[in-house]
Amino acid sequence: MRRCARVRGRIVISLLASAIAAVSGTPAQAYLKLGLRDSVGSVSLRWTTQPAHYSVNDRDVSGVSSEQLRQAIERAFRTWEDVPTASVRFQFDGFTSAEPLEDDNTSTFGFLSRPDLDRVLASTSFFVDTRTGEILESDVFFNSSVPWSVTQNGEPGRFDLESIALHEAGHFLGLSHSALGETEPRSGGGRRVLGAGAVMFPIAFASGNVEGRRLFPDDIAGVSDIYPDAGFRQDTGSVQGRVTKDGDGIFGAHVVAYDPRTGDLVGNFALEETGEFIIAGLRPGTHILRVEPLDDAEIESFFDRPSLDVDFQPTFYERLVVVPRGGGTPSIEIPVRAR
């Protein structure tokens, strides 16, 4: 039995359907960890004991049985467990009649009919210890008002359950959204995903697509940062610094490290008012840094604030950055100019 006499708060993260979502991304953003901030500081959300236990609701829906849902979730969790630089484990505790979003000290996956949330494919919520960031309970619901597929190659007009489960499992672990992806406007409104560089991109691929069943370097760096294996800190490095405009820091600017040897993109946002950032989990060696504004997305998909300073030009850092093994670079400053 988990301890319940703690300060608890609920956080909800939703995944949007590509066909009607109003969110878009740019091709160089990076993983963002879920966290809480108060007057003292901030904490990241994570499971402090493993395996993380979960149950699956026993209700079938059109086209998907509860057993098929369990199998899709199991495959999604296995994909995260297979990350060689992270240490995560999950334990299925059986089927339950309880539904997601019940405050019952049980993490439950299942379907809910939410036709009012016509943009939402799935949603993950948490109860957490707001002092430490420990995840106490996490529920995930898949919207049964949209059509789902569990076939190996996907089905036209139906969203791939395993792909969406993989995204929600990332939230379950404490990852927030990445904006590493490209979209284009749709004639009927919203945006269409052209390509995603992270499973944690907040807009799903179109129905019938199964490309979202694999992790990207951005996802791998994120989960390894939260749950590092024994050698992760020693075998990787980090880059740190500030993003400034006219001498002032820019909160929410995102800095991306590009590895020219592999083509991998990994990064993080400037998460302090001073514009300070740190990008962890980088392969040692030369990287190219680029800063871009979050000017083509709904801010609320990434941050709990109504606005950010996005009035600056995308900027490359003037020098190549050499990331050391098992350590960090000296702090650098990346000045940007207003548009």
What are the residue ranges of the model-derived segments?
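Extracellular beta-sheet/turn segments enriched in Thr/Pro/Gly and aliphatic residues
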Residues: 135, 221-228, 309-339
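Structural motif
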Residues: 242-253, 258-261, 324
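Bacterial N-terminal signal peptides
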Residues: 12-23
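Beta-strand-rich domain onsets/edges
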Residues: 209-237, 245
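Metzincin-family zinc-dependent endopeptidase catalytic domain
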Residues: 31-34, 69-193, 254-258, 268-284, ...
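Fold-level signature of zinc-dependent metallopeptidase catalytic domains
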Residues: 36-74
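A short, amphipathic beta-strand motif
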Residues: 237-245, 275, 334
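N-terminal secretory signal peptides that target proteins for export/translocation
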Residues: 1-8
